[in-house]
């Protein structure tokens, strides 16, 4: 049995997906951010066979400013949901860049892992990470339905509220 990890599956070059994901993004009035360069000793994406692994994308607003803070203290569940949604937009931007700006190469999203910077008594991590899951499935439809983990942590890089990888 092959071990699946957080990843997005990409299509063989010869097979094209009939769904126009760029059109869907436009219909949803979404704007993809610029795919960010890594801030450490790692790569933003790695392709292995037909699998695309995307490093953690941190919460940033429309202006590229970090969404910093702790759920259960500075932010509520709805704020976290929106921060996770922003992380997912960055995941899609990274996937698009890795696929030569051709999202039709995406076959499916296999798994997301979301990390929520939260207080000890905050327990809505799954609701927060729904922001990322809902965005991915709204763009990719059934191909965007994925396995998932939503993890609480007491700190995230640069003090951000949410981080999601694929």
Identify the role of each PLM range.
Residues 3-18:
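Short, Lys/Arg-enriched N-terminal segments with co-localized hydrophobic residues
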């Amino acid at each position: 049995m092959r071990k699946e990890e957080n990843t997005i599956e990409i299509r063989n070059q010869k097979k094209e997906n009939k769904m126009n994901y760029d059109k869907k993004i436009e219909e949803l009035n979404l704007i993809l951010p610029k795919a960010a360069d890594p801030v450490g000793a790692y790569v933003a994406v790695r392709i292995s066979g037909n699998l695309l692994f995307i490093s953690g994308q941190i919460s940033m607003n429309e202006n590229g400013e970090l969404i910093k803070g702790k759920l259960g203290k500075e932010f509520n569940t709805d704020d976290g949901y929106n921060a996770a949604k922003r992380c997912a937009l960055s995941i899609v931007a990274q996937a698009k860049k890795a696929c030569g700006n051709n999202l039709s190469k995406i076959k499916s999203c296999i798994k997301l892992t979301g990390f929520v910077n939260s207080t000890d008594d905050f327990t809505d991590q799954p609701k927060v990470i729904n922001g990322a899951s809902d965005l991915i499935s709204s763009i990719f439809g059934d191909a965007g339905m994925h396995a998932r983990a939503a993890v609480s942590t007491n700190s995230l890089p640069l003090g951000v509220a949410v981080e999601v990888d694929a």
